[in-house]
Amino acid sequence: GAALEPVPVASNIPIELDFSQDRGKIAVTFASPSDVPSTAKAIYMVGDEFGNMNWGSDGVISLDKVWNSADRWIHINYFNAGTKLRFSTSKIFGDGEFTGLTNNVGFEISDEGLVVIPQSGTYIIFVDLGSKTISIQKPVIYGYGTAAGGNNEKILPFTESSDGKTFSVTLPNGGRFRIHPYIPAFDN
């Protein structure tokens, strides 16, 4: 068969192989909020619908820095209801992994300790290491610049499709254009 993707694992992590069920289990303890650093060089996200919960997968998502900050990170994506996620400051099982911080907004934590997406739709995931906040909320996306009619960051709102998969806008002018996601967690 096809070669399996290698799994990056930190030292002293117990691994159990269950040949009767054709499964393996990596016994990882997620970092407590106080053990998650207040800044990071990167924040990664993996899920059961992308990356196959494997930090060695090509499907691992790198969150984007907010401006030039080392503590605030975002990612906008469409997720199916029930998608499970985990985050990390490195792409290694047992090193820097977390699923909840002190303030968790817009999601539940499963019995396995994983973040669970509440309903199918497009969400903005916001991780603020400084305030120890993870927020998963519906995005509001605006366009701005001369093509949008001005440089106010909230001048031209995009419209979300009924299935929540796409957002669209018609530009009133030609010229420069930027996209600005409003991040509700910044208001908290």
Regions found by a protein language model. Give the residues of each.
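Insoluble glucan recognition modules
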Residues: 1-188
